[in-house]
Design a protein with these regions (language model features):
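Conserved G/P- and acidic residue-centered "switch" motifs that form tight phosphate/ATP-binding loops
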Residues: 96
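N-terminal beta1-alpha1 cap of cysteine-dependent amidohydrolase-like domains
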Residues: 1-93, 103-105, 111, 115-144, ...
């Protein structure tokens, strides 16, 4: 039976790179949006994707003037799915907004607008790295990608402020120390990154390893 991973999304036009990355490593994507009934029944893992800013009220703040209009229904869906996945110890991979939700779920807060603009650099080719991250040794992310400096393509205007409980920081921006990777050591595979490996998976074998490791974590959980 094929491995199946739920992918959360809001804009169908933007979900293709995430789905393609999973197919590349032999996993069938199952798309889930807040517009339809959602659950993790019949799937073996969860990927939380990028998208618009989280509702600041979900971490006890008022919305910043430069924050995007939130989608509370998506926030509720992803928080519910993440809770279910962690309770069942299903493999979880968070990407960009997925890292931020991972932190908020665990009681953390966010920087609502990074004034420096260093993390919002965009290029015509989304796979092109824009800065480096430093991956911490003795973390699952280091076991997958290797410790030390790695070029990545992160692009975001929000980031982790207060770290949530049970979380370990696995990567930081080499420029300013912004959190770029989180994980839970007490779970089989609960990893989140701030950059967009789905855009690099075909051009950078190192980033493909992240999806391969995610897929390899699934067999113990394959749903009948």
């Amino acid at each position: 039976m094929a491995k199946r991973v739920a992918i959360t999304y809001e804009d169908f036009k933007k979900v293709a790179p995430y789905a393609d990355a999973l197919r590349l490593v032999g996993v069938d994507p199952v798309l889930i949006s807040a517009d339809e009934p959602w659950s993790l029944r019949g799937v073996d893992g969860l990927m939380i994707t990028g998208g618009r800013d989280l509702d600041a009220r979900s971490y006890g703040q008022e919305r910043h003037p430069k924050s995007q209009e939130p989608n509370p229904a998506r926030d509720r869906m992803e928080i519910g799915l993440l809770g279910e996945a962690l309770d069942r110890d299903l493999p979880v991979l968070g990407i960009c907004r997925g890292l931020q939700l991972f932190n908020v779920y665990h009681g953390g807060t966010l920087i609502q607008h990074i004034e420096s603009g260093k993390h919002t650099v965009r290029t015509a080719d989304a796979s092109q790295p824009v800065h480096q991250v430093i991956i911490a040794p003795n973390t699952l992310l280091a076991a997958i990608l290797g410790p030390g400096a790695h070029p990545v393509n992160s692009r975001h205007h929000q980031g982790v402020a207060q770290l949530g409980g049970h979380l370990a920081v696995s990567a930081k921006s080499a420029d300013d120390g912004m959190v770029e990777g989180l994980e839970r050591a007490d779970k089989l595979f609960a990893v989140a990154v701030q950059w967009h490996p789905e855009d690099q998976v075909k051009s950078d074998p190192l980033q493909k390893r992240l999806f391969e490791a995610f897929a390899q974590a699934i067999p113990a959980h394959v749903t009948a």
